[in-house]
């Protein structure tokens, strides 16, 4: 994009957090003065660095952060709730919109199974074709309704 071959983006959607494990460091990531001071080995630091880099390079671009979905596994869902809180804090600090796929996409832990096919997840974690369509329609609606 920077070399002019592609146009500057109007919208950028981050889908991040599903596999992150280093969830500490939110205050540190948000208090760093510059991106060079951010510890990118933490989820919060990596999210801040990635989002802020897009915002600095493309100030007219509207940025959205897509939160991880519910799964068929209780322990994974607990981790996703923690990850989602980190992403919410970083997103709020950078004033970018959160797309709450965890709580609003239509994929619910009550209809999914751990390690086997459920309503929309083929293995309890990853969406099947119908799940992908469901999430895609939800995200498209959120972008359309909130793009200004």
Language-model segments: residues:
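Alpha-helical cap/lid subdomain in secreted, periplasmic
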Residues: 1-148
